[in-house]
Amino acid sequence: MPKPTKGARLGGSAAHEKLLLANLAKSLFEHGRITTTEAKARRLRPYAERLVTKAKKGDLHNRRQVLQVITDKSVVHTLFTEIGPRYENRPGGYTRITKIGNRRGDNAPMAVIELVEALTVAQQATGEAEAATKRSAKDAEAKTEAPAEVVEDTKPADEAAEESKDA
């Protein structure tokens, strides 16, 4: 049996909090990023991530569950056709919260919550190229370090030979 959340709720009553989170999630999926208070952003994050996980599954049952929360069919359509497939290979962490300072009027701490962009093919190719560059740089460093060690080894031998000549 579901238990009500302990402590203060956003907006006063449980029903108002439920509607507030649904509207915040709708705006987040519609615009990709929204500016809100830190408290609302922290409450929205797990709520929105559960909806994205349902969208990733993409079956009728999950679509109907999301439609119970977000009543705008166009937003649900974009959630299931664009946002869900975008995070197909991502196991979680679909949102990011960035603090942006306090609001001017009431000094409330504000934050931006946004959908994290999934890696596109171009970004993956760039990442692979950077990894290859780093690997080649490490290989080059290893090659330059190996001759340096050989040079260091020859110096003590030369010094030892000079010392034996002096004796």
Swiss-Prot record:
GO terms for molecular function: structural constituent of ribosome. InterPro entries: Ribosomal_bL17 (IPR000456), Ribosomal_bL17_CS (IPR047859), Ribosomal_bL17_sf (IPR036373). Keywords: Ribonucleoprotein, Ribosomal protein. Residues 131-167 have a biased composition (Basic and acidic residues). The keyword rRNA processing does not apply. It comes from the Bacteria. Residues 124-167 are annotated as: Disordered. One of its GO terms (biological process) is translation. One of its GO terms (cellular component) is cytosolic large ribosomal subunit. Part of the 50S ribosomal subunit. Contacts protein L32. NCBIfam families: L17. Belongs to the bacterial ribosomal protein bL17 family. HAMAP family: Ribosomal_bL17 (MF_01368). This is Large ribosomal subunit protein bL17.
